[in-house]
Amino acid sequence: MAKHIVELTDALSNKIAAGEVVERPASVVKELVENAIDAGSTVIDILVEEAGLNKITIIDNGSGIEEEDVATAFLRHATSKIKNEADLFRVHTLGFRGEALPSIASVSHLEMETSTGEAKGTTISLEGGKIIEQKSGHARKGTQIEVSQLFFNTPARLKYLKSLPTELGNITDILNRLALAHPDISFRFSHNGKPLLQTNGNGDLRQVIAAIYGVSIAKKSVPVKAESLDFKISGYAVLPEVNRSNRNYISTIINGRFIKNFALVKAIQEGYHTLLPIGRFPIIVLQIEMDPIIVDVNVHPAKLEVRLSKEKELGQLISQMIKETFHKLQLIPDGEISKKQKEDQKSEQIQISFEEKKPVKETPTLFSKPTIPEYVPSDEDAPREDDFILETMPSYEPESQAEQEEHTKERIPKMYPIGQMHATYIFAQNENGLYIIDQHAAQERIKYEFYREKIGEVSRELQELLVPIVLEFPADEYVRLEEQKAKLEEVGVFLENFGQNSFIIRAHPTWFPKDQEEEMLREIIDEALSAPSISIHKLREDTAIMMSCKKSIKANHYLTTQDMEALLDTLREASDPFTCPHGRPVIIQYSTYELEKMFKRVM
């Protein structure tokens, strides 16, 4: 009788593994570049043709592979990075599973030339995972891997690939993240001979941000850092005035590995809370160092997802760090920000031509087969003008306690109202220039901070009602409110059972608007019903935002000069006067110099 359960061949096993490890050309680039990083490379060249479908070449100046280990490197689960089970819980390298090379080789034509620099090198060629030839090669230290005809033996995989621009975008995104994670390595990336990314490898993260996102973004970035017993965080956060429509510009790096973690992204967004408009996201790069024992990278073959044993503590540290950083800064955007923001948004969509295949001028580092040249400085290594611009950017040093207290008192300067536009915007001036204030957003911020404080101490300030309020609900809502009573009490709503499907309310906070008590109670109860699992903190926050929005002066509301003066003076006392609770700007400024430049009084 024939056996029904059989052991799969190595070739078939490698193809199955390739399905998890090698999803698209970007996966090949990621795995090979990570190998180059683990090899201690200081310069890595990435040459791609036709978005990687035609050819991918990775060249490094790392440690290389010994001749006797070259063939072994293409066996499944063969690796030099871990030796035993204990090592699996203290992974210090980007790769460790021993799956990348055999998986890539099984679905492509692959040629590798490598040398440790101490003896002759080795060249090996594989097709579909089978070794075709192995011979002596050049002795220059480093490794060059060329992958061509990707997915030649798995045509079904080709059907699921996206357009060439999309696949190239995936490769670019991977390399951007790796460059941000390793500013001490020089990355050179070209497509069809056209350079797309170059970093100088001098260890300056801000220079890498400039190379990837542009100098204008780097100028708007401020250093962030925090430390606890378990974590050390550093990086750059871009000012809230510059933001994006998606989360792609949030980069979290743990021990040199770019990772995706929803909880950490949520913590970052919490740090920017009320500083960004709804639906907008920050630009931020965080490098996090921790003991490998508290991070599990062995979750998925792609190694993008990780498990953290102290995830909540790390999230709280990140949120607090971002809040404290921006609380020390004056966040009044200049009058040009709207124009810059639109230009930045246009630059998010980069169109890449696939017709032009003429190579740019050859440099000593982007070399052709079969020689691995020395990595000598070229003109492209020389400092760029952008580098000098970045050197002049202001640094943000930690302030003393006295300076912080003074800064908190004077977050925005004294302004003198000179008029109102469309009964919506207040125009004000001082010696620094012209200010335009959104009157609704300004009062919304003031009232939000008032309600946020009051909601936290509702039990101390209650007003007994002469005529209690009775509220009736459908049966399903009544049952759900029974479960939410404790939460509602935290925001000033005290429900007592009063007959079938009814509650009676005998008191409310004194800060409820007069003659609008029942309306406010209904609003808060609806908020709790719409999100049954809402936390007390979030319910308080949402209640404060809702009340501040409804009770603030609206657009098309004329104000007297005295009203405007009072509003601006009260705004100066707010802890975060620059945005409304929804993240919209409260105030923008045109400096005297900018105005004089507009009118050509200065050149």
Curated annotation (Swiss-Prot):
It comes from Listeria monocytogenes serotype 4b (strain CLIP80459). It holds the Pfam family HATPase_c_3. Belongs to the DNA mismatch repair MutL/HexB family. Keywords: DNA damage, DNA repair. The gene is mutL. GO terms for biological process: mismatch repair. It comes from the Bacteria. GO terms for cellular component: mismatch repair complex. This protein is involved in the repair of mismatches in DNA. It is required for dam-dependent methyl-directed DNA mismatch repair. May act as a 'molecular matchmaker', a protein that promotes the formation of a stable complex between two or more DNA-binding proteins in an ATP-dependent manner without itself being part of a final effector complex. One of its GO terms (molecular function) is mismatched DNA binding. This is DNA mismatch repair protein MutL. Residues 361-383 are annotated as: Disordered.
